[in-house]
């Protein structure tokens, strides 16, 4: 059925196809014009160097601004650090590369959308996660679904998952 399965359903369909076709790398790339394809080669190279997930990060060498928009990113990064001891500078980045092990992880597990909270689970599975510095543009297309109500719901879901679900999932 090719019905609207929203972000995760569409993403998982891509991971399933990539697993079936034996792809080495999957690139997660937002369609709103923020991400530049010029970083894909560097991300793939990091997968080839043994990393399982490469995050295109705005904040490897740049400071994260203190804006209302970045408060959520800071909270999620802090929660991941508390639970895993690992520092993720840009956990909400939708610009990522995944190697074969993670392609399989995301293709087969309905409880594992490629969202910030599942980085906790990936660390527990001993997946290597690396961030590389990228520049992102302002949104060119579409509108964010994150209004005040949806932001509160999203942040609540992320915090519950990071603190109460991901640390206890069977690895």
Model-derived regions, located:
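Residue-level "edge-of-site" marker
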Residues: 31, 59, 135
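Catalytic donor-sugar/metal-binding loop of nucleotide-sugar-dependent glycosyltransferases
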Residues: 86-87, 109-110, 120-137
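Active-site-adjacent helix/loop segment of glycosyltransferases
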Residues: 171
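Acceptor/aglycone-binding surface of glycosyltransferases and processive sugar-polymer synthases
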Residues: 2-20, 25, 37-112, 139-149, ...
């Amino acid at each position: 059925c090719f019905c609207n399965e929203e972000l995760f359903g569409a993403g998982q369909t891509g991971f399933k196809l990539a697993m079936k076709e034996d792809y080495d790398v999957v690139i997660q790339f937002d369609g709103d014009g923020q991400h530049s394809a010029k970083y894909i080669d560097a991300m793939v190279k990091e997968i080839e160097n043994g990393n399982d997930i490469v995050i295109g990060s705005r904040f490897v060498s740049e400071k994260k601004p203190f804006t209302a928009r970045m408060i959520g990113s800071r909270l999620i990064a802090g929660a991941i650090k508390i639970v895993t001891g690992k520092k993720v500078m840009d956990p909400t980045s939708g610009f990522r590369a995944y190697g074969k092990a993670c392609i399989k992880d995301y293709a087969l597990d309905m409880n594992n959308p490629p969202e910030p909270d599942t980085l906790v689970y990936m660390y527990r599975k001993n997946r290597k996660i690396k961030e590389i510095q990228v520049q992102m543009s302002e949104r060119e297309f579409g509108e964010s679904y994150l209004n005040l109500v949806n932001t509160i719901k999203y942040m609540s879901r992320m915090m519950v998952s990071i603190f109460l679900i991901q640390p206890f999932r069977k690895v």
